[in-house]
Amino acid sequence: MAGASAKVVAMLLSLQGPXSLRMVSESG
């Protein structure tokens, strides 16, 4: 299941931008 979530997150990040990557890094 984690794999599916990762794919969704990756898609959202690609849409939002690098910025989002920082937020995810802090969360994950």
Swiss-Prot record:
One of its GO terms (biological process) is cell wall organization. It is a peripheral membrane protein. The keyword Secreted applies. GO terms for cellular component: extracellular region; membrane. Residues 11-28 form the Expansin-like CBD domain. Keywords: Cell wall, Cell wall biogenesis/degradation, Membrane, Secreted. Transmembrane segments: none annotated. Belongs to the expansin family. Expansin B subfamily. This is Expansin-B1.
